[in-house]
A protein has these predicted regions:
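Positively charged n-region of N-terminal signal peptides that target proteins for export
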Residues: 1-4, 20
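Sec-dependent N-terminal signal peptides
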Residues: 4-15
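N-terminal activation segment of mature serine protease catalytic domains
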Residues: 19-63, 72, 97
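Short Gly/Pro-enriched turn/cap motifs at secondary-structure boundaries
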Residues: 24, 88, 160-162
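Active-site region of chymotrypsin-like
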Residues: 29-38, 103-111, 135-186
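Conserved hydrophobic positions within beta-strands
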Residues: 51-53, 85-88, 143, 171
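Conserved active-site neighborhood of the chymotrypsin/trypsin-like protease fold
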Residues: 55-128, 133-137, 152-155, 165
Length: 186
């Protein structure tokens, strides 16, 4: 009888500890992550990927390769709302990142706060994937390496298992602030 009670109790504690590892800020932050769909000049889908808002007035980030050769682009929020990309503000082919403005259909959109300081090697990090589901499984890991690029910017190497569909998702610190954008490993 004791063996039968120990197994369910151990499983319950294991599940509880897994839930406890998901930071409290995830539920609110996941609403800032969206899907990106780009179209060619014939209005055929060119690419799909992810992105996220960094300001409540529609400023967003994603990977540049999604937009390469695109005639137009739209974003689709976790709630299923579609909004057009109205303006490209900057792009970097080398680091595969693009900054753009979305023509938002509301007064404001959920946005992530950008971290003011770079996380140190060994710091906890979470990657927040796009999800239309109520539950979300963020991926946790650690900062393995921090390199400075172009003087003031940082490039991070993380110990984190990432799937292909997780490219261009925000990488967050323990306070729920975004400090990076996930990219394919080279």
């Amino acid at each position: 009888m004791k063996k039968l009670l120990i197994l369910p109790l151990a499983l319950f504690l294991l599940v509880q500890s897994g839930w406890a590892q998901t930071p409290k800020w995830v539920e609110k932050a996941k609403r800032a992550v969206f899907s990106v769909v780009t179209y060619d000049k014939n209005d055929k889908i060119l690419n799909t990927g992810n992105g996220f808002f960094v300001s409540e007035d529609g400023l967003a980030l994603s990977d540049y390769s999604l937009f390469k050769g695109a005639e137009r682009a739209v974003i689709i929020t976790a709630e299923g709302k579609q909004m057009p990309v109205s303006l490209i503000l900057g792009a970097d082919d080398m680091y595969d990142v693009i900054k753009f403005r979305v023509a938002i259909t509301e007064k404001k959109v959920p946005a992530l706060t950008v971290a003011n300081t770079a996380p140190a090697v060994g710091a906890d990090a979470w990657m927040l994937p796009y999800s239309t589901q109520k539950s979300i499984a963020c991926v946790s890991g650690k900062v393995k390496e921090v390199s400075k690029i172009a003087g003031e910017y940082h490039y991070y190497t993380l110990s984190m298992q990432m799937k292909d569909k997780m490219v261009s998702c925000p990488v967050m610190n323990v306070e729920g602030q975004v400090f990076g954008i996930s990219q394919k490993s080279s």
